[in-house]
């Protein structure tokens, strides 16, 4: 990520030496135990989707905490791993909204400008939210703040109470916010199913003269 636009803009937004603090944190936790995703995938969302190309943001909470699931992209898992329940529901809603998608690795979304960002970028094995409140939130809030300053439209898709709290960071009238309940089985029937976030995001992008995302790719 070094030498990227992300690095330059985030360095301006964050307190001095914050990248050093993140590296020290990662040195410590990866040394002490099993952490997901693999260290070389921690910044995958920013590497797969350069700042200049971001058109949609889908905000998650933290990575999957089981073996071989997390790949540094919110909600996504490799094709070789069964889709977790939230991802099953995301693809179910996509099927109702725009049609069936035959695979569940979301890397092709990231390659089209969909930033798949978790608020925490690491998690200890088997401990959901185990790194919450330790280092990541100022960093990922800074990601949202620099995107808020973009001149081109960005659609922020916020699922669930945690993600929806971040909408206060999105103040630029050029951008759109689409929010609903979380796709988790605990809440999907309370407003996620039927919310049509994918077609709504595309409708906004097209209305602003931007190409739509091919969500089925």
UniProtKB/Swiss-Prot annotation:
InterPro entries: UDG_fam1, Ura-DNA_Glyclase_AS, Uracil-DNA_glycosylase-like, Uracil-DNA_glycosylase-like_sf. It is found in: Cytoplasm. One of its GO terms (biological process) is base-excision repair, AP site formation via deaminated base removal. SMART domains: UDG, UreE_C. It comes from the Bacteria. It is an enzyme of class 3 (hydrolase). Keywords: Cytoplasm, DNA damage, DNA repair, Hydrolase. The keyword Cytoplasm applies. Its EC number is 3.2.2.27. CDD domains: UDG-F1-like. It catalyses: Hydrolyzes single-stranded DNA or mismatched double-stranded DNA and polynucleotides, releasing free uracil. GO terms for cellular component: cytoplasm. The active site is at 62 (proton acceptor). Gene3D superfamilies: Uracil-DNA glycosylase-like domain (3.40.470.10). GO terms for molecular function: uracil DNA N-glycosylase activity. Excises uracil residues from the DNA which can arise as a result of misincorporation of dUMP residues by DNA polymerase or due to deamination of cytosine. HAMAP family: UDG. NCBIfam families: PRK05254.1-1 (NF003588), PRK05254.1-2 (NF003589), PRK05254.1-4 (NF003591), PRK05254.1-5 (NF003592), ung (TIGR00628). Belongs to the uracil-DNA glycosylase (UDG) superfamily. UNG family. This is Uracil-DNA glycosylase. It comes from Streptococcus thermophilus (strain ATCC BAA-491 / LMD-9). The gene is ung.
